[in-house]
Amino acid sequence: MHVDADAFFASVEQRDQPALRGIPVAAGDVVIACASYEAREWGVRAGMTIGQAVAACPRLRVVPLRPAAYDAASAALFAVFRRFAARIEPGSMEEAFLDTRTTPWATIDQLAAAVQRAVRQEVGLPVTVGAGRTKLMAKLASRSVKPHGLRVIHPAEERYLRPALLVDELWGVGEVTRERLRQHSIRTVADIGVVHPEHLRDIAGTQMARRLAAIAAGTDDATVRPERPRRSFSVQRAVPRGTPVDVDGLVAELAGRLRGAGLTGSVVSLSVLYAGNLEHHGRTRLGEPTDDPAVLAAAVGPLVDAATARRIERVGVTVTGLQPAGAAVQLTLDTGY
């Protein structure tokens, strides 16, 4: 089963501020991080500058990001998931695959409805639920009925649905691979099934060829991999032309995620994508582990300054060296990265 909160940041804002319900809302600082479905109807999308978004939708209400609120909502969401599933595989802070094979319930359709209802009643957020025999089918089911939909792809439906799937619809298959497949007139899962394995490896590479062959055979991944201890927290943002990197917004979201997890971090890394797909990376170690946005901003700022020789299209900040908040660690020169 795949469960995905709808327009997560915007939905949290609408939940917490009744005056925002039913109107176009977006959460963001310099750029839009998330738009409600009411705003999306006007063409507002994540990555737009606030000016672009307001030009597209003059009635748009833009609210600042509240990372701590989103982390609290995420924790409540996953608490509901754990009641219904033996194992959970997070996809992000607002979505996850649930292994419900051992959950006692009359039918999968009723179980999916129960999960959706529990999240709405206990967390106050709308979610879309999709279920299927494999993770691909569950993801396709949820994607097809957003927002706040519910769909179960039963094996009988899967038998005729799977061969007709377009390669563009396959979750986990990147655009580069899709384009290579199209260049060889491979447009559907049925097309994949008749390609010689060696030819498929030449087109897509060994690992992806195995995945594609499994999709064609109906033996693709159905294993829900349980949560693992966090090793990092990352935030990525598009940087619209003519706007500076929103360092404060990036670190505020990171700090909120760290605090929500009860963790601090000691290493900050910056990744930058320039026009033309050129990349730049920077890294610095903090004096001590922290979840303080001011300390994180002081570390990220110089890394960004060192990367602004060209126009930046996308920027990401990652915090590693995680440990529980309050743990005392004396860093030494030979600690290393």
What are these regions (language model features)?
Residues 2, 169, 179-314, 323-328, ...:
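DNA-contacting surface of Y-family translesion DNA polymerases
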Residues 1-211, 319-337:
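Gly/Gly-Pro- and Ser/Thr-rich, intrinsically disordered tail segments characteristic of DNA damage-repair
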